[in-house]
Amino acid sequence: MNILDKVDSAYLRDDVPAFRPGDTLDVHVKVIEGTNTRTQLFKGVVIRRQGSGIRETFTVRKVSFGIGVERTFPVHSPNLEKIEVVRRGDVRRAKLYYLRELRGKAARIKEKR
């Protein structure tokens, strides 16, 4: 293990659940507005997960008022209060970019049994 891995290991979270692309997540994000701190919920489908270690990120996509919204989060960020897996999706790809073009019921993902 080199020196960078030792430094990074101090910042790794141990409360991250196992999730994959296709899963639906509830991501509780800590939002700081001035002196106030509140929790904002972002619920959507994981369309990608990339990187490793402290640099690992995942992108969640949801449709809000007919407009697709994608947000990328660092997995080990201190601004994430918690990540909850709502349902497991059954997909055959690691990157679900094709969901960007699909609308309505076509954009649904089968639930894993």
Curated annotation (Swiss-Prot):
This protein is located at the 30S-50S ribosomal subunit interface and may play a role in the structure and function of the aminoacyl-tRNA binding site. InterPro entries: Ribosomal_bL19, Ribosomal_bL19_CS, Ribosomal_bL19_sf, Translation_prot_SH3-like_sf. Keywords: Ribonucleoprotein, Ribosomal protein. Pfam families: Ribosomal_L19. This is Large ribosomal subunit protein bL19. Belongs to the bacterial ribosomal protein bL19 family. GO terms for molecular function: structural constituent of ribosome. GO terms for biological process: translation. GO terms for cellular component: cytosolic large ribosomal subunit. NCBIfam families: rplS_bact. HAMAP family: Ribosomal_bL19.
